[in-house]
Design a protein with these regions (language model features):
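Conserved small-domain helix->loop->beta segment predominantly found in fold-type I
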Residues: 1-60
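PLP-dependent enzyme catalytic core of the Aspartate aminotransferase-like
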Residues: 49, 54-174
Length: 175
């Protein structure tokens, strides 16, 4: 949330929901019964098919759960539609499904309208460099063992002379 910020999270959520809508519409048009009426990223579908390469949750013998996330691609959705319906999904079909899914979003009345993640920390660190600086700043605030107790725990090692350490390099001790 710190890296993506409120705008990034909304973008990710909208994309995942859109892909889920495309999947639902493609499955419906392919004859697969979608049991989930209101969904965000997860669908329950009536099928006993397991798709190789995908981890479908077995809800029952005839129902599978399909969850999408920000790593899901258009190709993944097309592959799922093809595997579960037996119909190939080309780019034109996919774009048609996208347009149809956008018109029938089941969550339109549940969309949040108020501001989210309003604290400045969620609105300032949106590059890798800024994020690393922020994490380093947090690390510097932390009182850790490497800043406080290390001197007590390692004083015996510090006092060992180099000549005293030579025997640990002998093959008799190292193998």
């Amino acid at each position: 949330a710190v890296y993506h910020g409120p705008t990034g999270l909304r973008t990710i959520a909208a994309r995942v929901h859109r892909l889920t809508g495309i999947l639902a519409e493609g499955l419906r048009q392919g004859g697969v019964k979608v049991l989930t009426a209101r969904y965000f990223d997860t669908l329950h579908v009536e099928t006993d098919t397991d798709v190789p390469g995908f981890n479908l949750r077995r809800v029952s013998a005839t129902v599978r759960g399909i969850s999408l996330n920000e790593k899901t691609t258009r190709a993944d959705v097309a592959c799922l539609i093809e595997a579960l319906t037996g119909k190939a999904t080309d780019i034109a079909t996919f774009n048609t499904l996208d347009a149809q899914a956008a018109k029938s979003s089941p969550l339109a009345d549940l969309l949040r309208s108020d501001a989210i993640l309003t604290h400045p920390v969620f609105n300032t660190h949106h590059t890798e460099h800024a994020m690393l600086r922020y994490l380093k700043k947090l690390q510097n605030k932390d009182l850790a063992l490497d800043h406080s107790m290390i001197s007590l725990g390692s004083c015996t090692m510090k006092l060992n002379a180099t000549s005293e350490m030579i025997p640990i390099t002998w093959p008799e001790f190292s193998d």
